[in-house]
Structures are given as C-alpha cells and as structure tokens.
Amino acid sequence: MKNMKRYRSLDSWLRARHGEKVQKIPLDAGSGCPNRDGTLAAGGCTFCNALGSGSGRARESFAAQWDYWRGRHARSPRTKNVRLFLGYIQSFTNTYGPSSRLASLLAELEGLPGLAGASVGTRPDCVDEEKMALMAAAPWPEFWLELGLQSHRNDTLARINRGHSAADAEKAVLLAAEHGVK
C-alpha cells in the first residue's frame, strides 16, 4: 500500500488499455485563436503565452514533428522502448476556422507510425455539430477533445479574458457527449 495513489493517472489508464506505455507527442498545427486575432478580443487570455503552448514547430508537417519527438523519446532512458504514441494537437484553438481545416489536420495524422490515438485542444466556443461529427468519426482507438474549461463562473471567465461564457462550455461538453467524443 506504500505506493498507492489517490487517483488513476493517464499513464496507468493508457497502459491498462493498450497493454504498454503510450507517450503523448505535442503537435503544433499553427492554429489561431479568436481571442487573439481580434475576432473576440486581442492579446488572448491573461495566462496565454503569445507563442502558444506547443512546441513552436508549426512550420513543419505533422510527420516531421512526429519524427522529431519519436527520435527524442528513443534517446531517453525513460521512454526509449515506447512503441505507441498519442498525437496531441495542442497549441491555441485547433477547431478555429472552417471544418475543412480540422478535417485536413485529422487526415494528416493518418499513417503516423505507432499512432494509438489523438487529442485535439480547443476552446468551447469553437466547436459545432460539423466539427464534432468529424472528431467522432476519427479512426483511432483513442480520440479526445481537450476543451479549455478554466472556470464555470462567468465573472472568472471575464476576469481572465476568456471571451466565452459558462454556457458555451456547457454546450460544448453536451455536444461532445451527444457525439460520443471523449
């Protein structure tokens, strides 16, 4: 009982589900954000880095980014034997823009060696029926939508300059559930 955790980590859940370690790989799609480009506001959320949270490798294809990160993991004693990876399209708002852009991003993931699944980061006010249907049809065993839900309180959302409401967040969560998107 000495090493018993009070929670189940993502690592342990993925190991149990896939029978081996699965490593997340950050992928930078060069996405924008309506809270940075003037559509909703300028400057972004109070906590947002001007360069985003990704790797800064947006000028490279997903395949090139994938090779870079797999190479780094191959040299690390902790991850050198990892064979399965989760592609994490992380930086900024990856569902911002037309649905065809999201479809292109998802298509670019197909065929990456060792891809066990994908995760797409976005804002709750940038998903709709069409985009949710695209994500629900993703062909991988794992597919997750990572919604930036910093608060359920409108006063806090306004204070941190999120540019969306708690109702937007609720709508996005319900839409994901309706489509079976985790």
How would you name each of these model-derived features?
Residues 1-86:
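N-terminal [4Fe-4S]-dependent radical SAM core
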Residues 38-42, 76-80, 103-107, 144-146, ...:
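Short hydrophobic/aromatic-rich motifs at helix boundaries and adjacent loops
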Residues 68, 72-112:
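A contiguous, low-structure linker/loop signature
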